[in-house]
Swiss-Prot record:
Keywords: Lysosome, Secreted, Signal. GO terms for molecular function: chitin binding; oligosaccharide binding. It holds the Pfam family Glyco_hydro_18. This is Chitinase domain-containing protein 1. GO terms for cellular component: endomembrane system; extracellular region; lysosome. Gene3D superfamilies: 3,6-anhydro-alpha-l-galactosidase, 3.10.50.10, Glycosidases. Residues 27-46 are annotated as: Disordered.
Length: 391
């Protein structure tokens, strides 16, 4: 949903070269725990799995065992938006299977391009799968399909031209509305705020207001992706603040708040420290009036940091492989509310891994319930199947 996500995709598509394990680790890996395939009769939280001291064996054995009979029962009562990406097919399956636990799904399909003065075109429609959309709606008829609409390939001058012209905004809104109606979408998840690096915020407020009012007039939903209100690692104000939020809250249906990616390459650490996540919400909405429109972002992926300064995105399947290989002792950081583990390759390179666990998710879902927000998950196919018991 920003440059880091592009980095995530690139990292996933590039061939990854991994050093071999040390001889000791190789011997340990000779006997691996396999995942149980049977359906669980009770959700993960009732099976003693949501703990601060999980064993790697339990994660490997249980991660595919979700409670099938609990799929139609929602534990979290707020709004739940789940992102899916075309390059991760498992997310499509998750959206269908756990549809009753979601309130909206945002496929990462679409790009809004400016072709010239008062001329716009939405690309990516080839990814639209009507059969899948029908299946998601069958699983939960109330689920809204809100494709992400990324303002892509725009120059700074493109933004200036649109932000300074009511006619440009009118044409942009018309194009978005017509495509949504023609394709049967319920609205959009708009991603444009971060592209200007925090500049021209007053003008962006006007553009988003115009676009959301156009969509709302057509009985469509308008969600806005927003960066964290507290900059990661610095404590300084982010690119989207309380003033922006209060101006847009009356017209934007929901705000997808990116409360993750706190750490990154060269700066190893937690993905979403709990105190920081809380502060990002409170900075936007110290009072409760509009908090229900905030979708607290929850990452379903992790990062594998190396002592050389690199950081490899880590998805569920690879994390399970790694747990089998290194058989680590998971450590709990009480201050951040995250698990991590360490391992070392035979070339001497040390690694530290942060990946979501059931306890990680429980704390963030509980925080959302406490603050009265919804949640947004990036992205559905990257997590472990038993995660969804908590929803």
């Amino acid at each position: 949903m920003r440059a880091d996500w592009t980095f995530l995709l690139v990292c996933l598509l590039l061939p990854v070269v991994r050093s071999t394990l040390s001889k000791t680790d190789a011997k340990k890996a000779s006997k691996v725990q396999e995942a149980e395939s049977s359906v669980a009769e009770r959700p993960a939280q009732d099976r003693g799995l949501v703990v601060t001291d999980p064993q790697w064996r339990d994660i490997v054995r249980e991660e595919k065992r979700f409670c099938h009979q609990c799929i139609n029962t929602r534990q979290f009562k707020g709004a739940v938006l789940g992102y899916i990406t075309p390059w991760n097919s498992h997310g499509y399956d998750i959206a269908k299977l756990f549809g009753p636990k979601l309130t909206s799904v945002s496929p990462v399909w679409l790009q809004l391009r400016r072709r010239g003065p008062e001329s716009f075109h939405i690309t990516g429609l080839h990814d639209h799968d009507p059969g899948w959309v029908k299946a998601v709606r069958k699983a939960n008829k109330k689920n809204k399909i809100l494709p992400r609409l990324l303002f892509d390939g725009w120059s700074y001058q493109d933004y200036v031209s649109v932000l300074d012209s009511e006619d440009e905004m009118e044409e942009l809104g018309r194009e978005a509305l017509e495509v949504a109606k023609a394709e049967g979408f319920d609205g959009y998840t708009l991603e444009l705020w971060s592209q200007l690096g925090g500049n021209k915020r007053k003008e962006l407020v006007h553009l988003v207001t115009h676009l959301c009012e156009t969509l709302n007039a057509g009985k469509l939903t308008c969600v806005l992706v927003i960066p964290p209100s507290v900059a990661p690692g610095t404590g300084q104000p982010g690119m989207f603040g309380r003033d922006d939020f209060e101006k847009l809250a009356p017209v934007v249906d929901a705000f997808s708040l990116m409360t993750y990616d706190y750490s990154g390459p060269g700066r190893p650490g937690p993905s979403a420290p709990l105190p920081w996540v809380r502060e990002c919400v409170l900075q936007l909405a110290p009072e409760n009036q509009w908090r229900h429109k905030i979708l607290l972002g929850v990452n379903m992926y992790g990062l594998d940091f190396s002592s050389h300064g690199g950081a490899e995105p880590l998805l569920g399947a690879r994390c399970i492989e790694l747990l089998k290989e290194v058989k680590p002792k998971l450590q709990w950081d009480e201050n951040t509310g995250e698990h991590f583990f360490n391992y070392k390759r035979n070339n001497g390179v040390k690694h530290v891994v942060y990946y979501p666990t059931l306890k990680f998710l429980q704390l963030r879902i509980s925080l959302a319930a406490e603050l009265g927000t919804g949640i947004s998950m990036w992205e559905l196919g990257q997590g472990l199947d038993y995660f969804y018991d908590l929803l």
